[in-house]
């Protein structure tokens, strides 16, 4: 068993967590979490013992969602979306070094494409799981399989949580989008 640290951000109907809510989380198995709230956002910082990161995160999600307080997990942190500055900080490089890797002016090339652009389109964000996978190939001595899997699991769990929220929508637009994209999803998953 290893110890894994992560934060679950969750939504709950109440304006704040009561002592009874905290007791319910504890009784559901959340004794290894520190619960907090800031600006209407609820979170739980877990230090969870488990065989692997997936087991740790899934068991923690189950604690939050089965405690009987109406909580629904919306994401796991640390966040998978990173800027050049975040990549530099997490890899121990300078911003300029990362920029050169991103632009293919240093390293082997093939740096992952940005996942999105924010603001006026100048600020790019990458999926950290993709970046770690690239670094694992580029610098295998610094990035082992376990850290690569850790970030991949967190990214996939977050994607599942986003998809779950979308799948629960029943308005006409959501139904039309799901129906229209189903063939594309089937083609993509068949590859």
Q: Positions of the model-derived regions?
A:
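A short, Lys/Arg-enriched interface patch at domain edges and termini
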Residues: 128-185
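Short glycine-/aliphatic-rich beta-strand segments at the starts of folded cytosolic domains
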Residues: 1-14
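Polyanion-binding surface elements
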Residues: 77-103
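Short amphipathic alpha-helix segments
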Residues: 11-33
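DNA-binding alpha-helical recognition surfaces that contact promoter or target DNA
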Residues: 58, 100, 133
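Short, intrinsically disordered low-complexity segments
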Residues: 31-67
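Major-groove DNA-recognition helix of helix-turn-helix-type DNA-binding domains
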Residues: 93-123
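Short, amphipathic alpha-helical "recognition" segments used to contact nucleic acids or chromatin
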Residues: 68-80
């Amino acid at each position: 068993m290893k110890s894994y640290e992560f934060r679950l951000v969750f939504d709950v109907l109440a304006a704040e967590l009561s002592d009874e809510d905290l007791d319910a989380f504890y009784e559901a198995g959340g004794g290894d979490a520190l619960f907090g709230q800031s600006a209407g956002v609820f979170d739980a910082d877990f230090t969870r013992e488990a065989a692997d990161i997936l087991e740790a995160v899934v068991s923690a999600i189950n604690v939050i969602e089965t405690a009987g307080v109406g909580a629904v997990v919306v994401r796991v942190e640390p966040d998978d979306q990173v800027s050049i500055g975040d990549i530099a900080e997490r890899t121990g490089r300078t911003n300029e070094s990362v920029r050169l890797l991103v632009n293919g002016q240093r390293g082997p090339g093939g740096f992952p494409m940005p996942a999105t652009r924010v603001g006026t389109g100048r600020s790019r964000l990458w999926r950290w799981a993709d970046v770690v996978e690239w670094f694992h190939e580029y610098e295998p001595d610094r990035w082992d399989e376990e850290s690569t899997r850790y970030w991949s699991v967190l990214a996939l769990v977050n994607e599942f949580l986003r998809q779950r929220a979308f799948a629960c929508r029943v308005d006409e637009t959501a139904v039309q989008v799901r129906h229209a994209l189903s063939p594309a999803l089937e083609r993509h998953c068949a590859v």
